[in-house]
Amino acid sequence: MGLDLYAYKVKNLESYNKYLSSCHNYNNYSAFLWTKYEKEVNKAYNRYCNWEAEHQNDPDYSLKENPYSYGINNFITEEEKNNENELATYREFAKTNCNYHEIESLYMRKHYWFIQYLYHKYDDKMIYRDGDIVKTFSGEQFIITKTDLKDIIDRLQRVIDASKNNLDTYYNDPLVYHSLSDEPLVNKDVMDREFPIYNEYHFAARMDWNYSYTTINSYLNDFKNVYSEMKDEELLVYVESW
């Protein structure tokens, strides 16, 4: 389970799949080049490190330039370089064509309730391997349609609606003491029902920010704003990062 989830918007599934395909082709070719020239690169890297070790105590070390370079471009042929550049150019074209851009307001940092929703949505494409949850679909990215987004909004709205009493008690009850680090929480039972834990082993240590009223309500409004401007064929793409 990643710590961060980055949200992107794309114009439709067809153009997005072409972008994924272009990324796949570029990555495969880069991996092929690395496998082919791995020994040469490692030897060059060792020469680079040896020179650094020999000269780092020289009085004029900061003025010297290491004569050795270990970049793979020093070894690939001109044809291979052109092939890689062509694949990189097509990848960037496909990215532009699908209008792949980040939606910063929907970035998630350790918001386990949302990753749980995504894991449940893709349950048939998740497997357990070596004690971890592994995605088996192309690109390892979660696709959210406009219909899915409406479902998320409805779930969050039910959580907020069920939490009004919590908010009233928090601000209006004179007998309730709050430290500076306190904040109002949503109704935990409703939150856990709308965004159930995907697997107890992976989500046993749920953090308090899963239940922050302010945070949940803020994301609800952000999702609503994105939904109101979203075309039917557009998609949200969430990328999990470690």
Task: Indicate where each model-derived feature is located.
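Conserved GNAT acetyl-CoA-binding A-motif
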Residues: E234-V237
